[in-house]
């Protein structure tokens, strides 16, 4: 069964077409980004030709974009990120640019969408609005790079946002919340945050959660499942994956390591 997940202003959906087919003309109410995962897929626009997608090509469709879908021989599998109007209003940076359909044969646009798909397929519990907004900012920033501005000096709000995430990594913050507090567009916020701190906002939040979990694991006797929830992870498996990415060690092994007080030699420094 195709995978689907609705979170706040977003819908993440997989579509599987097993056979060659030409669908009748249709249009959707909401803007969306589509990634062709495998197979052959083409959108036919009456009177305007068509756009043929190869695997890992990404496309954008504005609301009410009338078209027909043609699935090639052997079928196709696609991933779509749908934006409710509130999300579209926050993120789509140039009305003129986003009023027409777009197609990108570009890894920087495709890979954040692909990461959302792999999370949907393997660990949907780890997805939340903050992570989705961070990935969407990557997509839009790459697709619209020639319209993005770069800061030459570190804005004060970068450190303010960093402190907000560090102080409350387990909270319900969103990228759009932090951008609004900074007085900048969400795409500019995410790009500038990474420019000066070297990581995406969601990566920074992940590290802050791991740090909180480390403190709880060594200073309390809470079961690791409760440590995970207290630090903001969806569950213990979510925390274990994050520990592996950030520290290269499992939470249980980290706790055991720091609770082993046997002397290993003279103290240094």
Model-found features: residue ranges?
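N-terminal regulatory/effector-sensing and dimerization cores
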Residues: 1-98
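Jelly-roll (double-stranded beta-helix
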Residues: 22-24, 98-103, 125-130, 148, ...
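Glutamine-centric residue-chemistry signal
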Residues: 32, 188, 236-238
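Amphipathic alpha-helical segments enriched in hydrophobic/aromatic residues interleaved with Lys/Arg
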Residues: 93-152
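Solvent-exposed, amphipathic alpha-helical segments
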Residues: 109-123, 157-168, 212, 216-220
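Short, Lys/Arg-enriched anionic-surface-contact patches
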Residues: 148-156, 191, 199-208
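Terminal helix-turn-helix DNA-binding modules in bacterial transcription factors
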Residues: 163-176, 195-240, 246-249, 253-269
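Helix-turn-helix
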Residues: 179-185
